[in-house]
C-alpha cells in the first residue's frame, strides 16, 4: 500500500451520483472508490450532491473529497469551484482544467493552437439548418464522421455516420444534449488507444477493440466482449512518444493530477487526439484500474494514490 497513515486524510467525501446523463456510471464508480478507500482504512463516506446541499460537506467536517462524479456540474468546473470556496481539497483538475476538459469544442481549439494533433472537425449549433450544414460538412470532411455533443462524456449521444443522408438526423439528436455539436472526421486504420494519467505513475497505453462500430456507452459499461489490450501492441519507442504527447495534451488544457487522454491512430500510425477525461470512470469496466492492474497496482492502492495528491 502507500505507506501513508490513513488518519492524515481526515474525513473524506466520495462524491458520486449527481444529475448528469452519467449518473448511473458515477454511482458505480463511487461505490467502488468508497470501498477501495475504506479497505485502506480511510474514513470515507458517500455524498451525492443531487440529494444533499454542498454546504453539508463543510458542516459535517469533511476536509477532502474524491470526485467520482462524471459529466455535468461534477466535471465542468462547478463542483471544483464550490469545493475551492469551502476550502475542501479534492481529486483531479481544478476549475479551468475541468471546464476545458469537458468541452470538446474548446479542447480542440486549444490543441490546434498548441500543436496537439486532433481530427479535422466542424461545429453545428442547435437550431441550425441541419440538412444544409450536413451538405457543407460532407463536402469538407467526407464520410465516415463522428457526431457528438460538445460537453457530454461516456460517449453519450455519440454516433458514427457513414452516409451523408444519415447526418441531419444525427445532428438533431446530438443537439438535444448540447447547443454545440462537434462533427469530426473519423480516423481509420490504426485503432483506438487511451493513455491513463495518474500523478507520477508510468501506466501502459491500452488499445481498445470494441466488438461494435466504436467504443460507445454500451461497449464502455455494459458489454463483456470489448477487448482491452495491454500491452497495446506498439513498440516501446512509439508507446513512450504517444504517452508524452498525451501528457502534453492534458497539461496544455490546465488539467492536473489524474485522468485520461484518448486518441486514434491512422493507417500510417499517426496519432489524433479526441478528448481528455478529468474524472474518469472507476467501474470494473473502466480503464485506469485496468492500466494500474497491468503494472501490479491494485484498485485500493490506485484510489489512495489519487487521493494522496490532495495532501500536497
Curated annotation (Swiss-Prot):
Compartment(s): Cytoplasm
Protein's gene: ddl
Function of the protein: Cell wall formation.
Binding site for ATP: 138-193
Species in which this protein is naturally found: Burkholderia pseudomallei (strain 1106a)
UniProt EC number: 6.3.2.4
Cofactor(s) needed by this chain: Mg(2+); Mn(2+)
Annotated GO CC locations: cytosol
Record domain ATP-grasp: where: 108-308
Protein name: D-alanine--D-alanine ligase
Amino acid at each position: 500500500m502507500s505507506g501513508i497513515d490513513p488518519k492524515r486524510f481526515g474525513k473524506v467525501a466520495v462524491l458520486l451520483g449527481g444529475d448528469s446523463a452519467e449518473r448511473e456510471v458515477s454511482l458505480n464508480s463511487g461505490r467502488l472508490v468508497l470501498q477501495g478507500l475504506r479497505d485502506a482504512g480511510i474514513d470515507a463516506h458517500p455524498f451525492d450532491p443531487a440529494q444533499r446541499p454542498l454546504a453539508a460537506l463543510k458542516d459535517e467536517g469533511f476536509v477532502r473529497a474524491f470526485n467520482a462524479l462524471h459529466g455535468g456540474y461534477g466535471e465542468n468546473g462547478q463542483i471544483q469551484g464550490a469545493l475551492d470556496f469551502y476550502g475542501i481539497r479534492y481529486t483531479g483538475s481544478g476549475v479551468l482544467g475541468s471546464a476545458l476538459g469537458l468541452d470538446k469544442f474548446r479542447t480542440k481549439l486549444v490543441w490546434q493552437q498548441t500543436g496537439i494533433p486532433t481530427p479535422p472537425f466542424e461545429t453545428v449549433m442547435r437550431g441550425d439548418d441541419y440538412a444544409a450544414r450536413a451538405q457543407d460538412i460532407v463536402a469538407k470532411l467526407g464520410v465516415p464522421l463522428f457526431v457528438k455533443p460538445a460537453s457530454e462524456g461516456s460517449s453519450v449521444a455519440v454516433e458514427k455516420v457513414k452516409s451523408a443522408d444519415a447526418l441531419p438526423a444525427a445532428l438533431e439528436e446530438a443537439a438535444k444534449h448540447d447547443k454545440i455539436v462537434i462533427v469530426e472526421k473519423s480516423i481509420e486504420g490504426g485503432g483506438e488507444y487511451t493513455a491513463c494519467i495518474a500523478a507520477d505513475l508510468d501506466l501502459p497505453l491500452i488499445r481498445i477493440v470494441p466488438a461494435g462500430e466504436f467504443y460507445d456507452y454500451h461497449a464502455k459499461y455494459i458489454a463483456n466482449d470489448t477487448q482491452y489490450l495491454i500491452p497495446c501492441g506498439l513498440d516501446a519507442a512509439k508507446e513512450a512518444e504517444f504517452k508524452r504527447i498525451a501528457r502534453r495534451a492534458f497539461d496544455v488544457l490546465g488539467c492536473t493530477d489524474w485522468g485520461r487522454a484518448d486518441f486514434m491512430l491512422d493507417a500510417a500510425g499517426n496519432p489524433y487526439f479526441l478528448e481528455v477525461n478529468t474524472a474518469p470512470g472507476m467501474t470494473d469496466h473502466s480503464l485506469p484500474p485496468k492500466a494500474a492492474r497491468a503494472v501490479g497496482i491494485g484498485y485500493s492502492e490506485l484510489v489512495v494514490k489519487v487521493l494522496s495528491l490532495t495532501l500536497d
